[in-house]
Amino acid sequence: MRPFRTLVKVLQKIESSPLTKVFMAFIIVVLIGSYLEFLTQRNVKYSEIKNYFTAIWFTMETVTTVGYGDVVPVSNLGRVVAMLIMVSGIGLLGTLTATISAYLFQIRIERRGKLEKRLKNHTIICNWNAYTRNIIEGNRDEEAAPIVILSENTDNSEKYQNVFFVKGDCTSEDDLKNAAIEDAARVVIMSDIENNAIPEDLLDAKTLLSIFTVRKLNNAVEIIAEVRDEKNKKHAVSAGATEVLSVGELSSRLISRSISNPGLTDFILKSLSETEDFKIFSIEACGILPGMTVKDAASNLAEVCVIISVISKGKIEYPPDRSYKIGAGDYVVFLAKNKKEVEEAIKG
């Protein structure tokens, strides 16, 4: 009984499909039109439509606008039937073509709901807004970790190398699982400012809910979140975020410092740009660094970078004490032309 029920469900799904309905209508027009043409032409003198197959051949020539002209109706009644076939058949064929295109497009959209291949240690960026594109552009290194964009709005996004798009909502556990949240190394939660369905004063609420959901599914993943209101930063940390950024706070502080420090804004922006010769990087202490003082590390790495800070257990050492011993798990912040050169130098 179970196979029979499954077959019934499949047939019901096929029957309810718009593509099936249009296709069946097209077949009916072809079969009925061919039969009427056959009836009107089989006894007409000089007519070449003497059997049903030839009538079908003529009908298909007509609806597909091929028009070989090898078979044509002779009588006036046959020509009237041919005109009806032209009007109904050609219209249905156009509708069928459009329906097939829409069906294939829908399949492509549905496939975006899941990754086509399994990823590990990737970065998931939740929500698409004006800043998301800049994040992708800044992480287009060939050896960079794969990026998965999880958003309801991905239709207008471009294709990038090593970037995958999953259509969904970052507050949904199922959608996060489709983006392989269990194996992700980090999650970046952008404010969903382009979602017109969410009032501006509730954007941070969605961000907090997203943090809760992500942390529930992966307790070890690094979560970087953006909030609109600086007051919600502590709530985001309580929800499980590793780092919390407020665009408004960054902008206001940068402008404030630039008033009495000419050139500071230009320096900071250039150090964060992908097009400049020097950039700010951070790297977890490994290789020769653990156990080494900041002074010795700066001396060993002088040819490839300038150490500007050390972050230990969330505490920022700036400027770092020259006698401070770098520990395992610390992060070293530096200025350099190329991060790979620093990584190679650290290996020893």
Curated annotation (Swiss-Prot):
Residues 120-246 form the RCK N-terminal domain. GO terms for cellular component: plasma membrane. It comes from the Archaea. Coiled coil: none annotated. Residues 266-348 form the RCK C-terminal domain. The chain crosses the membrane at residues 19-39, 52-72, 80-100. Signal peptide: none annotated. Gene3D superfamilies: 1.10.287.70, NAD(P)-binding Rossmann-like Domain. One of its GO terms (molecular function) is potassium channel activity. It is found in: Cell membrane. The keyword RNA-binding does not apply. Keywords: Calcium, Cell membrane, Ion channel, Ion transport, Magnesium, Manganese, Membrane, Metal-binding, Nickel, Potassium, Potassium channel, Potassium transport, Transmembrane, Transmembrane helix, Transport. Heterooctamer composed of four full-length subunits and four soluble RCK domains. PANTHER family: POTASSIUM CHANNEL PROTEIN 2-RELATED-RELATED (PTHR43833), POTASSIUM CHANNEL PROTEIN YUGO-RELATED (PTHR43833:SF9). Calcium-gated potassium channel. Can also be activated by Mg(2+), Mn(2+) and Ni(2+). This is Calcium-gated potassium channel TvoK. The gene is tvoK.
